[in-house]
Structures are given as structure tokens and as C-alpha cells.
Amino acid sequence: RRQRQMCIRDSVQVENPDFTLYSDTLHYDTESKVATILGPSVIVSDSGTIHTSRGWYDTVNNTSLLLDQSQVESGEKILIGDSIFYNRDTGMGEVYGNMSLIDTAQHVTLQGEYGYYNEQTGYAFATDSARFLEYSQGDTLFLHADTLQMVTVDSVYREIKAYYGVRFYRIDMQGVCDSMQFNTRDSVLYMYTEPVLWNEQYQLYGDTIAIYMNDSTIEYAHVIQFAFAAQHVDSSYYNQLKGNDLKAYFEGQAVHQIDVAGNAESIFYPLEKDGAKVGMNETKSGFLTIWVKDNKLDKLKIW
């Protein structure tokens, strides 16, 4: 009877019209055409390259199970995971355990304990300790949520959507909200459902917050509806602003101007040069602007 299993060792090369498999050690089933990979291996095709040391590859259906932090490279993206179910024909990779999707062109990384990526559509999904890192500029944006999605808008731009328990951090800001959306095309980060944004001594809160970024710095934060801002004075006192709409403008990494439009109210605790408080000032107006210098109120205009 013809032997089905072939055990091949040392500088193995399997040629196929669609790919070439290089391996240290593999078992090959001549009937099912399935190659069981037992050593460092590389599978090269027009669609990309696979690096693995353990798993199997169905040479008929172009499907595979890749184990032990294997890598699937397609263009400028690298998919890594403990266990990857990969279909080369559909471009779909499903990952269980320590998933990472690295976009080397856009300088972003999507991570989670479970997720999948479609090479053909550019859609990626991650959940269970899901994380997103954006490091195209000087400061890295760290984002965590229950569920993350990355949508490829075109060859250049990406759209990131985060759901449930969203937390993010960058050297000049940090925030929490229930859901969030970030578009690399216009560099605007949208925070929805009880969003809170912190910057140095300031805390911003409202119905929705849109953060407009220019290169590696924040240009301004737009708090839409039920806008509120608080600045920490000491353990018992906070300067406060509220209104229908609020825009906080940044210079460097700090707030330098805040505009409030519609039912504008303010409470401020003026300080002497030695830091002593000298009472409380309260205003109500249609519109309000404050200018900040060295994290202290410099000027206030109401109208």
C-alpha cells in the first residue's frame, strides 16, 4: 500500500503554482495535500509571506492553522497571534491569543486577545483587552476599550472606532468615554456618551467632545452641548465654566484660551502673587472668553 505520510527534513522546499513553502521540518500527506509544519518555515506567495514554526497548511484549499506567534505579512501589514486561522484566498485571518495587527506605513498597531483581519477590505476587529497605538507623530496615543474596529478608508487613511469602557492617554491629554471615533484623514478624535477630557489642571465634560489635532499637538477641543470645564486651584476649590458650547484652544501642551457660547457662566477664585485666594468672582452672560497664562486666569471677557 502506498504510504500517505512523508516526513521531510532539512532545507525543505515545496513548489506550488500559487506559493512556495520553505521549511526545516514538515510532514506531508500526499492524499489530503496537507503539510504539517514542525519547524521554522516560510510560505511565500503573491499575496504575502507567512512566517511560522508550527501548524498546518492545506495546499488545495489554501487554508492554514498557524501556532506559536506566527506572522502573516501582507503588503505593509503584519498579523501576529498565538493561533491564526488563515485563508489565503479570502485574505481572512482570525486570531486567538495575543493578537497584533501592525500597519508599518501608518504607524498604528491594533491588539487584543481575540480578533480578525480581512486583507481584501482592510477591516480589522479586536476585543478582550483591546488596545490601539498610534505613533505616527512625536507622541504615542494609547487607546484601550472593550471592542476596537479599524476601517480602511483608502490606501492612506484609517478610521478607528472604540466601544465600551474607552480610555486613552497621550502625554498632553487623557480621557474616558463610552465610545470614540478617530479618523486619520482629518485627525479629529470624537468622544461620545459622558466623555471627560483631562489636560494638566483642566477637566472638560459635555455631551460630545471633538478633539482637533494638528500634527503631534492638540489644536483645540470642542465640547458640544452641556459643556463644563473645571480648573484645579487647590484641594477644595475649582475655577469653573459652563455653557451650551465650549472650545478650549491649546498652545504647546497647555490650554491658553477658552470660548463659551450660550448661557455662559463662570466661577473664579482670584489669587494674589503669593497664591493666596482673594474671594470669588461669578459671572453670567451670553458669551464668555478667558485667556490663560502659566495655568492662571490672565483675562476674562463677557458679552
What are the functions of these language-model segments?
Residues R1-R2, Y22-T30, H51-T59, I80-D89, ...:
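Extended lipid/amphipathic-ligand handling interfaces
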Residues G55, S100, A105-Q106, A130-H144, ...:
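Acidic/polar low-complexity surface segments
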Residues Q3-C7:
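Short, small-residue-biased leader/transition segments that mark boundaries at the very start
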